[in-house]
């Protein structure tokens, strides 16, 4: 389910397409059904044994469209559906997706669903315009493999490693300090 806000779905669409390709290539996956938040039908949700929520975070939290889906599903009878999440954020640190992940975990716990894990993507908007796309593709492939095997997964990726981020930040601040004391 591409459950993000309508204006933000364009940013996660490439991740969705790549995930769909990898899931379709798995022999174990016999039915891939991609839904959008606006075409979502809560009556069919629990016909699937696995569901992946895919969205970009808004203010480090789940978008309102995803929360609306959660609310609709609360009244439905449940089976033991496995829930996965692909969460993208515009911040450099993939850890900015942690709050969204915890909300999904808590919702799954309350609704007696099995949360199997997530792929958290930091600096998603930059990745789409850079050569780093292939790195993310490898993580999406690993994520799809875990889904195909019904395994738990906890992956995170960002365009910048901590080391590169710190080096770039230090370079910037050193330059700013030199400007100030000239």
Predicted regions and their residues:
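A generic structural signal for short coil/turn motifs at secondary-structure boundaries
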Residues: 6-7, 92-95, 127-130
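Glycine-rich phosphate/pyrophosphate-binding loop and the adjoining helix
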Residues: 121-182
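A short, well-structured beta->alpha microelement
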Residues: 24-44
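Helix-loop-strand module that forms the ligand-binding subsite of alpha/beta enzymes
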Residues: 39-111
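N-terminal beta1-alpha1 ligand-phosphate binding loop
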Residues: 1-24
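Alpha-helical scaffold elements within enzyme catalytic domains, especially in hydrolases
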Residues: 18-21, 72, 107, 146
